[in-house]
Amino acid sequence: MNSLFLINESFTNGYISSVLDIISILAIFCGISVIVNKNPIISVLFLIGLFASVSSYLILLGLSFIGLAYLIVYIGAISILFLFILMLINIRISELQSNTNNSIPLTIILGISLSYSLFQLLPYDIAILSNFSSNINNNLYNLSMNKQNNGNFGINTTPAVSLQPKNNDLLFVTSKIWDGNLAESNHITTIGNVMYSNYSIWLFLASFILLLAMVGSIVIIMKSNASWGGALPNTRETKTEGR
């Protein structure tokens, strides 16, 4: 990433950073339990715990809108819908006792590939709080101010401001791309600008896929109702013939 800046971490809302590590470990445990458990109802319950841990992690980071969206959409709608459907379906005991160890290698491969792709994009946290890091802070700040003062022929006329953190605050790296804008503006404004400007095509594709899923489910239900309606008279005729 280009144009990296070191700024003070102020998004934990007063919480200790170790709480975020505990929530991350809890999310990993819930994700593994979703795959390992043979009972689908228990898997859905662990899935609800996974979504709850992710939403709490986002809320503690300061991304309150995204965390509440996770809480409302995934837990309040999708997970409860899965649980309701599984409670309505008559699950056989033989299916619950089936071996699911074949999916573990696929899960490991998908997890490694996803982690590798995320580590290439996400910035790393910096916990080195020394004079060297404070010097880097000041140098990067001066470079950014030099870029802004183009009318002064690249000469920085503002005094250098010491950005050395107080009370051993955590530092992190951000950039000028859209993920760093979440910390600088309103969350809803940033998400709207990103979705309807840079990723508008993907938004249209997602809405088209959802429309196809809705139409497909309606067609399947209509076909099943038609087949059931044609089968009912035959069963009645067989009953009358038997009498």
Swiss-Prot record:
A cellular component annotation (GO) from this entry: mitochondrial membrane
Enzyme Commission designation: 7.1.1.2
Keyword NAD part of the UniProt annotation: yes
Subcellular localization, as worded in the UniProt entry: Mitochondrion membrane
Main location: mitochondrion
Alphabetized UniProt keyword annotations: Electron transport, Membrane, Mitochondrion, NAD, Respiratory chain, Translocase, Transmembrane, Transmembrane helix, Transport, Ubiquinone
Enzyme class: translocase
PANTHER family found in the cross-reference section: NADH-UBIQUINONE OXIDOREDUCTASE CHAIN 6 (PTHR33269:SF17)
Known function: Core subunit of the mitochondrial membrane respiratory chain NADH dehydrogenase (Complex I) that is believed to belong to the minimal assembly required for catalysis. Complex I functions in the transfer of electrons from NADH to the respiratory chain. The immediate electron acceptor for the enzyme is believed to be ubiquinone.
Family indicated by similarity: Belongs to the complex I subunit 6 family.
Protein name: NADH-ubiquinone oxidoreductase chain 6
Organism (species): Neurospora crassa (strain ATCC 24698 / 74-OR23-1A / CBS 708.71 / DSM 1257 / FGSC 987)
